[in-house]
Amino acid sequence: MSSLRAHQKKNPTPTQCQNQTTLDSICKDIQTGKITRIVALVGAGLSTSSGLADFRTPDTGLYAKLEPLQLPYPEALFHISYFKHTPEPFYAIARGRHPWNTKPGVGHAFLALLEKKGVLGFVFTQNIDGLELDAGVSRERVMNLHGDWSDQHCIKCRSSYPADRMRKAILTGEVPFCVQANCEGIVKPAIVMFGESLPEGFDSREEEMLSTADLLLVIGTSLKVAPCSEIPRRLPSHVPRVLVNRELVGNIGTRESDVCLLGDCDAWLREVARHLGWDEELESVWKDTLVRKEKSSRDKGWDDKAEQSPTLEECIVRAAEQMKVRMGVSEGHRRMLEGHLGEKMAEIMAKRGQ
């Protein structure tokens, strides 16, 4: 089974790379029925307009804001080995990035519109925010490669953890612990951290979708996390790839059939909709998704919680202060960090030796 691995500019104006294939020709093929099975691979850049910072953009990305936490390296925030010993940073970030704080953007609505038009084959999402589903994309057409917030369990005894207690933990930023007698293990949401296996069935689903796709749409991803980063490379060379992103990533742009739309994701997807004659319908679909999300938030009592939530930056500062008090002079914490860094270095050296 595949596992999640981490590998260690913003464009001022939207630009389209000049290849043989163009946006016009792609849209024409969709309109004439030549393209009927679009597979999408989406990353954090799809959700930036929803208020969720991506990870690697200098100055504004999540990793650029983590300095107060003094992590051994940015990805440690989402590494299972680090989480097992030091879960405080993760829950500080979770408090500021939980789905109750977010609403679908135009990009999420665009995916829902593709399905409505009958041309969406599947969505591989690296996001854990669930905004594709909130926008109306059918659950059976989405694979959350990095999991989601739908469930939670103890990492020690694997027992399920009450949803109401998890909501309280996220709201306060406190680490939740198992409620089973004599366990006291750390509780983790159903997200996939670095060092954990991807969802069961990923390999077979990837093979199935790439073998039947007639277009790959890559939106808002750095393609720096394997095995997701390999999806565009594994696509048959005759199938066009459309990149919607701030910058070029992977090897997209090297094939004559590639189309690279560089700039703001929402702006470009609106432009694609305009080329297809779907611009008014896209705005209508987006408006409907916002109404549904607001109603869902009210029904779950999330709207009040969202108003109470501090900013991401405030969550980070508070967590840093708490960690300094709790673990600043802990010899055990120092040994844990040294051991974790040793494991990380061993992984790097092993990869280099392959």
UniProtKB/Swiss-Prot annotation:
EC number: 2.3.1.286
Residues in Deacetylase sirtuin-type domain copies: 16-279
Cellular component terms per the entry's GO annotation: nucleus
A GO term, aspect molecular function: NAD+ binding
Active-site residues (renumbered): 146 (proton acceptor)
Zinc as UniProt keyword: yes
Reactions mediated catalytically: N(6)-acetyl-L-lysyl-[protein] + NAD(+) + H2O = 2''-O-acetyl-ADP-D-ribose + nicotinamide + L-lysyl-[protein]
Enzyme class (EC, first level): transferase
UniProt record, GO biological process: rDNA heterochromatin formation
Reported cofactor(s): Zn(2+)
Keywords of the record: Metal-binding, NAD, Nucleus, Repressor, Transcription, Transcription regulation, Transferase, Zinc
Residues reported in the UniProt entry to bind NAD(+): 43-63, 126-129, 220-222, 245-247, 265
Gene3D superfamilies assigned: SIR2/SIRT2 'Small Domain, TPP-binding domain
Leader peptide range in chain numbering: none
InterPro entries to which the protein is assigned, alphabetical: DHS-like_NAD/FAD-binding_dom (IPR029035), NAD-dep_sirtuin_deacylases (IPR050134), Sirtuin (IPR003000), Sirtuin_cat_small_dom_sf (IPR026591), Ssirtuin_cat_dom (IPR026590)
Cofactor note: Binds 1 zinc ion per subunit.
PANTHER family referenced in this protein's UniProt entry, alphabetically: NAD-DEPENDENT PROTEIN DEACETYLASE HST2-2, NAD-DEPENDENT PROTEIN DEACYLASE SIRTUIN-5, MITOCHONDRIAL-RELATED
Protein task: NAD-dependent histone deacetylase, which could function in telomeric silencing, cell cycle progression and chromosome stability.
Name used for this protein in its record: NAD-dependent protein deacetylase hst2-2
Naturally occurring in which organism (per UniProt): Emericella nidulans (strain FGSC A4 / ATCC 38163 / CBS 112.46 / NRRL 194 / M139) (Aspergillus nidulans)
